[in-house]
Amino acid sequence: MGKYAFRRLLQLIPILFAITFLSYGMMRIAGSDVVTQKMENTGQILSEDKLNAAREQLGLDKPFLTQYFVWLGKLLHGDMGNSYVSSLPVFDTFISKLPATLLLTVTSILLTIIISIPLGILSAVKQNTITDYLIRLCSFIGNSLPNFFVSLLLMYFLAIRLRIFPVISKDVSLKSVAMPAITLAIAMSAKYLRQVRATVLDELSKDYVAGAKARGVKFSVTLWKSIMKASLVTIITLLMLSVGNLLGGTAIVESIFLWDGVGKMAVDAISMRDYPIIQAYVMWMAIIYVVVNLLTDLSYRFLDPRIRLGGVKQ
């Protein structure tokens, strides 16, 4: 286990190196350096000589690889440059958005677990009954509705009509995060309860369930001690992937509710061509998915002892 984790961590080094190279190259391909962008933002008109002098002062006249390694050295010391728009350090700007994103992620995941797992189990246990059909219908509707439409519905009924929650998220609090979290939880629950149902149905068809029933073991005991334990690998995989998506920010939902998280920050940066912020966001997304995949692989060994971390199942 320890050797596998160490080997995977070593494999992350070239991946992260490639991510930094591609994200830095992306900014160069964009065709607008810090001097040009600041000039556009401030409305200044500089002569070509002054532009070249400013680029030389910032080292932008040097070869691409030289600029990259200088930037990489600063990055390793926590210096990601300054925003083109606010002139604030990118690292500080990014860190200031993380609490909102973390709160939205945790709240959405908890709501998804509370909704999808019980309903998925109930749908499987009550297969081909009215209960099963109603749950599957709700899942179909939830999958069909886009997030922006659900956001507007919740905003109209819960905020404008019933006035339970604020229309706009003014701070990072549970009351403000409620509607964005419910919106995301509806979409994820609609998708995941079908997966939970399919996994539980697969376990119900296996011989050990019939054997337990023949021995007089209560179904509730078999369900929670055997069936759910065998289904955990699928459930954990789905939840870990959702964590990756949510930590990367949910741009549409955050923008609608003005939730000041990473996703909204990325949308604002794209609209204002704030390339250092975009660059930091791209690296954050890539790192999150790499780390989440690693943690998912490591969790398999704890959830199912039959799985060997080399990819072979005993």
Where do the protein language model's features map onto the residues?
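Membrane-water interface segments at transmembrane-helix boundaries in multipass membrane proteins
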Residues: R136-A198
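Alpha-helical transmembrane segments of integral membrane proteins
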Residues: G2, F94, L98-T131, D171-Q314
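Hydrophobic alpha-helical transmembrane segments of multi-pass integral membrane proteins
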Residues: F17-F21, V106-L110, F149-Y156, M283
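Cytoplasmic-entry segments and transmembrane alpha-helices of multi-pass inner-membrane transporters
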Residues: G2-R7, Q11, P118-L154
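Hydrophobic alpha-helical transmembrane segments of membrane transport/permease proteins
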Residues: L16-T66, R163-M179
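An internal, D/E-rich "acidic patch" concept
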Residues: L60-I117
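Hydrophobic membrane-targeting alpha-helices
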Residues: F21, G25, I29, L122, ...
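Transmembrane helix irregularities
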Residues: A30, G142-L145, L247
